[in-house]
A protein has these predicted regions:
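A short SAM/SAH-binding and catalytic strip from SAM-dependent methyltransferases
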Residues: 109-122
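A short glycine-rich, Lys/Arg-flanked "PGG" loop and its adjoining helix->strand segment in the class I
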Residues: 125-137
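Core SAM-dependent methyltransferase catalytic element
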Residues: 214-244
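Conserved class I S-adenosyl-L-methionine
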Residues: 1-37, 52-56
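C-terminal alpha-helical "lid/dimerization" subdomain adjacent to the S-adenosyl-L-methionine
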Residues: 144-212
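A generic alpha-to-beta junction signature in SAM-dependent methyltransferases
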Residues: 36-37, 60, 83, 135
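A short acidic, Gly/Pro-enriched loop at the edge of an enzyme's catalytic core
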Residues: 101-109
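Class I SAM-dependent methyltransferase SAM/SAH-binding core
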Residues: 44-46, 50-98
Length: 244
């Protein structure tokens, strides 16, 4: 989740409105929120964007403190405006692989939606370690994102074929079930996914394995409908007795 992801500053759409037409995205976010522990007091929203997921977390846990982190200044500004009257919610500029501005063991939950596929593959170990660090013992990391079926070098025929087929099917689904604008957004971003330019799909197992390697006690993969679109929620837990 580097500065490359700030291309979202330049996407000329009403992000909340367009994503709101997509039932598959709504289902993914709902599945993520369903994983929130009822007693969570402090929540970190990674790649918080305009605050769509933040809003759902606030509804689910009205007394929790929520901190949103995003690399795109325009997104941070929009989210701050949206939550200007909420003293328990704040936003800051930052990236998943460097949460050095946040203290150790300061959150019960780290949650993310449609954001961490912006990470460069080489930064996954650092991001996983940072997520583990900021969570309290027993804390949970919830990652709702889009994934692919094939790993491999960027530009390899097998990987590119999988990504092209998957995202083309998604575009057709969006046109049929969501909106023309949602389909166009997918098509506009397709070259970035194929070049792995700020939009880099992985298999869910790739993420799970890095979380376990970082020291998470367990990590589960939850499929959401329609399963063929390969949206998944990864739920990883820090051991209750783990060092902070």
């Amino acid at each position: 989740m580097t500065s490359e992801t700030t291309h979202w500053n330049d996407v000329g759409i009403d992000y909340d409105k367009v994503l709101g037409t997509d039932a598959s995205n709504v289902a993914l976010l709902s599945a993520a929120v369903d994983q929130l522990p009822s007693g969570a007091r402090d929540i970190l929203d990674i790649g918080s964007g305009t605050g769509r997921l933040t809003s759902l977390c606030r509804t689910a846990l009205p007394e929790a403190r929520i901190v949103g982190v995003d690399p795109a200044p325009a997104m941070v500004e929009e989210a701050e405006s949206k939550f200007a009257d909420d003293p328990l919610t704040s936003f800051r500029h930052g990236v998943a692989e460097d949460l050095s501005g946040l203290p150790d063991a300061s959150f019960d939950v780290a949650i993310s939606s449609f954001a961490l596929h912006h990470l460069e593959l080489g930064t996954y170990p650092k991001a996983a370690a940072e997520l583990l660090r900021v969570l309290r013992p027993g804390g949970v990391f919830i990652n709702a994102d889009q994934f692919c079926r094939v790993m491999g070098p960027a530009g390899s025929k097998e990987r590119a074929t999988d990504v092209l087929a998957l995202l083309t099917d998604k575009a057709k689904y969006y046109l049929r079930e969501a909106s023309f604008e949602r389909m166009l957004l997918q098509i506009d971003l397709l070259p970035r996914f194929l070049r792995e330019d700020g939009e880099i799909l992985t298999t869910p197992e790739f993420w799970r394995d890095h979380l376990l390697d970082a020291g998470f006690a367990e990590a589960d993969i939850v499929a959401t409908e329609p399963v063929e679109l390969f949206n998944r929620v990864i739920v990883a837990r820090k051991a209750p007795g783990a060092a902070s």
